From Swiss-Prot:
Reactions performed catalytically: adenosine(2503) in 23S rRNA + 2 reduced [2Fe-2S]-[ferredoxin] + 2 S-adenosyl-L-methionine = 2-methyladenosine(2503) in 23S rRNA + 5'-deoxyadenosine + L-methionine + 2 oxidized [2Fe-2S]-[ferredoxin] + S-adenosyl-L-homocysteine; adenosine(37) in tRNA + 2 reduced [2Fe-2S]-[ferredoxin] + 2 S-adenosyl-L-methionine = 2-methyladenosine(37) in tRNA + 5'-deoxyadenosine + L-methionine + 2 oxidized [2Fe-2S]-[ferredoxin] + S-adenosyl-L-homocysteine
Cofactor: [4Fe-4S] cluster
Compartments where located: Cytoplasm
Chain positions recorded as [4Fe-4S] cluster binding sites: C112, C116, C119
Annotated GO biological process: rRNA base methylation; tRNA methylation
Note: Reaction proceeds by a ping-pong mechanism involving intermediate methylation of a conserved cysteine residue.
Domain named Radical SAM core: residues: 98-337
Classification lineage: Bacteria, Pseudomonadati, Pseudomonadota, Gammaproteobacteria, Pasteurellales
Protein's gene: rlmN
Record's keyword annotation contains Ubl conjugation: no
Species of origin: Mannheimia succiniciproducens (strain KCTC 0769BP / MBEL55E)
Name of this protein: Dual-specificity RNA methyltransferase RlmN
UniProt GO cellular component terms: cytoplasm
InterPro entries membership: Aldolase_TIM, Methyltransferase_A, RlmN_N, RNA_MTrfase_RlmN, rRNA_lsu_MTrfase_RlmN/Cfr, rSAM
Amino acid sequence: MTEKINLMNLTRQQMREFFKELGEKPFRADQLVKWIYHFGEDNFDNMTNINKKLRDKLKAVAEIKAPEIAVEQRSADGTIKWAMQVGDQQIETVYIPEADRATLCVSSQVGCALACTFCSTAQQGFNRNLTVSEIIGQVWRASKVIGEFGVTGIRPITNVVMMGMGEPLLNVANVVPAMELMLDDFAYGLSKRRVTLSTSGVVPALDNLSGMIDVALAISLHAPNDELRDEIVPINKKYNIKMLIDSVNRYLSVSNANHGKVTIEYVMLDHVNDSIEHAHQLAEVLKNTPCKINLIPWNPFPQAPYGKSSNTRVDKFQKTLMEYGFTVIVRKTRGDDIDAACGQLAGDVIDRTKRTAAKRQFGQNIDVQLQ
């Protein structure tokens, strides 16, 4: 028996080709995308503007399948974390409500291969890339849950950030089509400024990205010099800070989504990267790059070798950068009581890399495949 095609793996253009191959009019794809994403429908029989003959044909060859929720946890601050089942493993997706928006933090891989030393996900190792349906399916599943609770005042998703488990630019082949669906007016219709891709700095993939899609960009920098970044963000040994910042500036030069500015993410690690001297170094690194800087309180996880920067050290770091004219925001920690805060996502990962502590030191050995 031929395996059914999961229509969530297709962009609208790909679905139009799929319908042509079925001998049907391409506009049927527009209808189906609306049913799936506007109305959260995964049952062909409920698609009333599609005739029964076509519905029966679709049921024979296709399915609409998103990850199922295995566990839901709710924080006192309104944050919701879902562990979603993908095969025999789990990924994590986080809903973060705020006064004027609601952001969904989406995973791109089962685990992560980059081995950043301050991140819980990295300690789980890496298993595989998520498919398009497993990425966009996180948005679909979360929207469906929130829709069911809409009467209680839970805010619909307004923003999506590719900041969950994994490095998005090591899964370009699936992340970009998923983001296309986030932007597609027939699907979720989010503004390109409300879809953010966060990367630790896979420079060749970032250089290619501008020709594929225009979305908001966030850079996980976390250190102001190569010596320190080599240690805590090992991919820096392959693509150093200068290479990364040059690539960022190239992306900004052709992007409309970023308003000419990139977001720089900087986790505050006590007496590691949070001194006044580090702040001066960071200002020098970013002096020719229009940006806003997010200072992120570090969120602890078991066996981590770090401490959280004191409020005093964070304040001094922020003020030093602001004296240079930078916009600097100290991110409010959300969902830390359910381990849903930045750097705490772990999921349930079968590590295929079998990395040792020694291997983790060699970021230059990270295999970067551009797809």
